Structure formats: C-alpha cells, structure tokens
Amino acid sequence: LQFTAALAQRLTAEGAELWLDTTARRLLGGPAGVEGVETSRGIIDADAVVVAAGSYSPALTRRFGLRLPIEPVKGYSVSIPLHGIEGAPGMSIIDDARKVVVTRLGEQLRIAGKAEITGFDLRLDERRWRAVREQGLSRFPRLAEQLADAPSQPWAGLRPMTCDGPPILGPTPISGLHLATGVGHLGWTFAAGSARLVADQLEERTCDLDPAPYSLQRYG
C-alpha cells in the first residue's frame, strides 16, 4: 500500500491523471488501429493504449481479432490478524513442497496458494482456503496454536497465465495497441520491470532488457 501510494503521488506530480474505480469497457478504433478506450467514466482518446488487464486482457483485444494465449488460474489467500502475537515470520517464506507462500504484512499474516482452472469463477471454496491456511501454518506449530481461534479473511483472485510461462510485453500487429499482461503469479514482482520495458518500446528507446522473449511475436 505504501509503495502504490508513493507511486500514485509521483505519477500525479509528473502530470499523470489517475482514473480510479473505473472500468475499461472496450477498445475503440477501426482498420487503422486502436484510437482510445471506452470506460465507465467516458471515452479516452489516445494514440497508444497499453492493455494491462490481467486475465481479462483477451476480452479487450478480441474485438480487433487479436487472440491472446492467456488463461485465468484461480488462487486463494487467507489473511489472519496477529494482534501482537510473537513468532510470526518477518520475511516472506515459500513452501515449495506445499505450494504456499507465507508473508507478514504489518500486523497480519497472509498465506497464499492453490491453482484452480475454473474459468472466471471467483467463488470462495471453503475447503480450499482452509487448506491453504492449514498448510501455511503447518511449518509454524507454535504460531498455529496461538492463531487457532483467530478469524480468517479469505480471498480469491485470477492469475493471467500464458501457455509458455513468460509475460507478453510490448507492441502488437494492431497499430497503437501494446500489451503488459500474462504475468501469472508474479504480477507484483514483474510490475516495475514490465512497465519500463513497455515504456521504452512505446518511446522507441533502447531497451536495457532484450524484449524478444516477452514479445507476442514469439507465438508466430
């Protein structure tokens, strides 16, 4: 939250206009390419548009005949308040055997994991999120005892997975349309680097990173 708040402050100071709580309904344009976006707050005219809509990116690009090899993969997280309890890990821990991640976020513990191919179904399966909680706490038996009666806040989200793993970053065959999507479960990890790579290509600057492995053209 602190990072995103600081980033928003920096962007607005540089002249960016942030439209929060706004839905991007469809891309606008025609044979010449993309010319803007229709949103729940009105139309934005643009010479270039970056689609960074995660699992919903294919729905936006389909109108221009561009089919993206991205599928939603559902994951769960469970947040548990600590209320001053000691013994919680001070850094993120990945349990590769159980496929869960345990992270302390201030005064709460967040456990995330699972991978379900269920389309865009975001319903919370209690069996699944309780399994995530149990698996995450199993490495910390004393902490598990202390949190046995603590409330849980479950959540489910969709990871935009490409068919080969890496994200899709950069221009498309459609004039004015660029992509920053398909980051899978590494959205936060890849965010800043993806933005830099896409921005460099938009501005036709030399990229510090070879863009070819992330280009849509790799699919032929």
Curated annotation (Swiss-Prot):
Pfam families: DAO. It comes from the Bacteria. Keywords: FAD, Flavoprotein, Oxidoreductase. One of its GO terms (biological process) is D-alanine catabolic process. GO terms for molecular function: D-amino-acid dehydrogenase activity. Belongs to the DadA oxidoreductase family. This is Uncharacterized oxidoreductase in pyp 5'region. It comes from Halorhodospira halophila.
